[in-house]
C-alpha cells in the first residue's frame, strides 16, 4: 500500500517519528537501528515502509533499507512472532549478522535478543534457515565478525548491567573479524565511555 516515504522529519521520539510528505504527517514506528541513523528534525529522510492493519488499528513501520524491511516481513511469518519481536530483532542486530546467526544455527546468540527465548529461537531457525539468503540479499557472511565472539561478548556486557539489545549492539559494533571476546568487550566499553 505505502512502500516508501520521502519527506521532512518533523518529530523524533524513540521509537516513533513523523515524516511530513507534501503537508501530510505520517507517523511511523522504527527499529532503534534505524532511529539512531536518522538525521536531525528538519532534514529530509527516505524510508522503506510496511503497513499493517488489524481489527481496530493500523500501523506504519519504517526502515532505512530494503533488506531491513524484507527481514521484518520474514520474521512476522514465523509462528509466534509479531511486530514487537521483529522490531526487537532489527534493533539488536544487523540484517547480515542475523542471517549469519540463522545460517550458523546459533540458538544461544538469538536468545540474547529481547523477547526471544530458546523455543522461539529454535522455531526461527527451522522456519527461516532456507530464507536467510532472501533477506540478506544473498550476501555470504563469511569474513564477517565471528558470531560466537559477538554473542559471548554481549552476554558478558549484560552481566555488567547493559540491557540485552544494547549489549548486542555494542558487541557487534565494537568487534572486528580477528578480535577475541576480551578485545570486543574492551572496545565496546571504551566506545561507551566516549
Curated annotation (Swiss-Prot):
Homotetramer. Forms an RuvA(8)-RuvB(12)-Holliday junction (HJ) complex. HJ DNA is sandwiched between 2 RuvA tetramers; dsDNA enters through RuvA and exits via RuvB. An RuvB hexamer assembles on each DNA strand where it exits the tetramer. Each RuvB hexamer is contacted by two RuvA subunits (via domain III) on 2 adjacent RuvB subunits; this complex drives branch migration. In the full resolvosome a probable DNA-RuvA(4)-RuvB(12)-RuvC(2) complex forms which resolves the HJ. Keywords: Cytoplasm, DNA damage, DNA recombination, DNA repair, DNA-binding. Residues 145-194 are annotated as: Domain III. GO terms for molecular function: ATP binding; four-way junction DNA binding; four-way junction helicase activity. InterPro entries: DNA_helicase_Holl-junc_RuvA_I, Hlx-hairpin-Hlx_DNA-bd_motif, NA-bd_OB-fold, RuvA, RuvA_2-like, RuvA_C, RuvA_C_sf. GO terms for biological process: DNA recombination; DNA repair. It comes from the Bacteria. Has three domains with a flexible linker between the domains II and III and assumes an 'L' shape. Domain III is highly mobile and contacts RuvB. The RuvA-RuvB-RuvC complex processes Holliday junction (HJ) DNA during genetic recombination and DNA repair, while the RuvA-RuvB complex plays an important role in the rescue of blocked DNA replication forks via replication fork reversal (RFR). RuvA specifically binds to HJ cruciform DNA, conferring on it an open structure. The RuvB hexamer acts as an ATP-dependent pump, pulling dsDNA into and through the RuvAB complex. HJ branch migration allows RuvC to scan DNA until it finds its consensus sequence, where it cleaves and resolves the cruciform DNA. Pfam families: HHH_5 (PF14520), RuvA_C (PF07499), RuvA_N (PF01330). Residues 1-64 are annotated as: Domain I. This is Holliday junction branch migration complex subunit RuvA. Its main location: cytoplasm. GO terms for cellular component: cytoplasm; Holliday junction helicase complex; Holliday junction resolvase complex. The gene is ruvA. Belongs to the RuvA family. Residues 140-144 are annotated as: Flexible linker. The keyword DNA damage applies. Transmembrane segments: none annotated. HAMAP family: DNA_HJ_migration_RuvA.
